Structure formats: structure tokens, C-alpha cells
Curated annotation (Swiss-Prot):
Disordered: region residues: 43-94
Organism: Dechloromonas aromatica (strain RCB)
Record GO cellular component, one term: ribosome
UniProt KW keywords: Ribonucleoprotein, Ribosomal protein, RNA-binding, rRNA-binding
Any Gene Ontology biological process: translation
Compositional bias per record (Basic and acidic residues), positions renumbered to this chain: 45-58
UniProt xrefs under PANTHER family: 50S RIBOSOMAL PROTEIN L4, LARGE RIBOSOMAL SUBUNIT PROTEIN UL4M
Gene name tied to this protein: rplD
Quaternary organization: Part of the 50S ribosomal subunit.
Pfam families per UniProt: Ribosomal_L4
Claim: Electron transport is one of the keywords in the record: no
GO MF assignments: rRNA binding; structural constituent of ribosome
SUPFAM superfamilies given in the database record: Ribosomal protein L4
Protein name per UniProt: Large ribosomal subunit protein uL4
Residue stretches spanning the membrane: none
Length: 207
């Protein structure tokens, strides 16, 4: 599979011979959906706490006598049927949202995403990317010269501090190391800018 490599002016400079296993795979929507949902589920933390009927504070006195009032039987105002009572199935911080995806499925799913990005011309490869100083203006000028304004994911083989600092104030741009690339980020951004060394890292991890 040949990928187009651009220069800093956004013009095609060369072709990169990439792995067909990683960039020439058919798109499997069901598999991609599964790994995206699993990734999001595994990122969840149990941060909600509700009380059941044994945990709410309430009197133990029976609200009214069992018979003779014409009203329904009631034994406690901590009942889930009552306002202020406990929940029937309360949320707990101990809930486990994790979903298991085996390595083979994950690799296949990432390959399907990268292949589809390449087919849709949303994957752009550059020889290397850096900025001279941690200035957002310098970074935005560089992206503009490459014609890559807008919703953009930038992936490098190693995190460049100047690149990271100059991009973190941009709401539509995210800079990641290759080993931090995840399915949610890859499908979310309109364009993905990848360095040649990052492509090699992808092939090493998922190829």
C-alpha cells in the first residue's frame, strides 16, 4: 500500500510503501464499533453513589396502621416507592464497566480504521514535524501552509515538547505519540497527520 507523503507546503513529496496488512484491510464496521465502545467503557470510572433502602436515614416507625385506613400497606418511609426513599438498584462506585477485547481483535480493528482513513484520503503522512519554539502562532502557521486547518489529530513517534505546548491551546487539534493512539481519536478527527516514524511504529505495534 502506497501512502502519499507531503512536505511543509502541503505538496506531495514522495510515496511511502506501507504494510498492506495495516493499510490495505477491508473496513469492518461491526469490529470498529466494538473496539470503540470497549475503549470508551474502559475509560469510565465509578464516580456515582446512590443509597438503597438500608442506607437512607428514616424512622423505623410504621407510617400508619396496617388495616382500616383504606390506604395501601406501608411499613417504612425509606421504601423506594416513597419520595426520599432508597433506590431499588442504586449506582455504586464499585460498578465495573470494563469490556474485554483480545489483542488480535484490537489489532484488526485499528488496521481497519487506518485503512479506511487512507482510502478516504483523511490520512496524511509527513516526513517529520516540529516547531522552533512553543508558540501556538508558529504551529497554526505551519498547519495553514500545509492546508490542514480544522479538526486535526497529529501523531508523532515521540512527543515533541514544543509541538505539544504549541498545540494544547487549540480546541480542534490533538497531538499524540504513536503508542498513545486510540480508536476513538482516530475516528473522531476529520484529518490525521502522521510522521513517517509514527507509521513505522504503527506497523511494529499492529502490523
Amino acid at each position: 500500500m502506497e501512502l502519499k507523503v507531503i512536505n511543509e507546503q502541503g505538496q506531495e513529496a514522495a510515496k511511502l510503501q506501507a504494510s498492506d496488512v495495516l493499510f490495505g484491510r477491508d473496513f469492518n464496521e461491526a469490529l470498529v464499533h466494538q473496539i470503540v465502545v470497549a475503549y470508551q467503557a474502559n475509560a469510565r470510572s465509578g464516580d456515582r453513589q446512590q443509597k438503597d433502602r438500608s442506607e437512607v436515614r428514616h424512622t423505623t416507625t410504621k407510617p400508619w396502621r396496617q388495616k382500616g385506613t383504606g390506604r395501601a400497606r406501608a411499613g417504612s418511609n425509606g421504601s423506594p416507592l416513597w419520595r426520599g426513599g432508597g433506590r431499588i438498584f442504586p449506582n455504586s462506585p464499585e460498578e465495573n464497566f470494563s469490556q474485554k477485547v483480545n489483542k488480535k481483535m484490537f489489532r484488526a480493528g485499528m488496521a481497519a480504521i487506518l485503512s479506511e482513513l487512507a482510502r478516504q484520503d483523511r490520512l496524511v503522512v509527513i516526513d517529520d514535524l516540529s516547531v522552533d519554539a512553543p508558540k501556538t502562532k508558529l504551529f497554526t502557521q505551519k498547519l495553514k501552509s500545509m492546508g490542514l486547518e480544522g479538526n486535526l489529530l497529529v501523531i508523532t513517534d515521540e512527543l515533541n515538547e514544543n509541538l505539544y505546548l504549541s498545540s494544547r491551546n487549540l480546541p480542534n487539534v490533538l497531538v499524540l505519540e504513536a503508542q498513545e493512539a486510540d480508536p476513538v481519536s482516530l475516528v473522531r478527527f476529520a484529518k490525521v497527520l502522521v510522521t513517517k516514524n509514527a507509521v513505522a511504529k504503527f506497523e511494529e505495534m499492529w502490523g
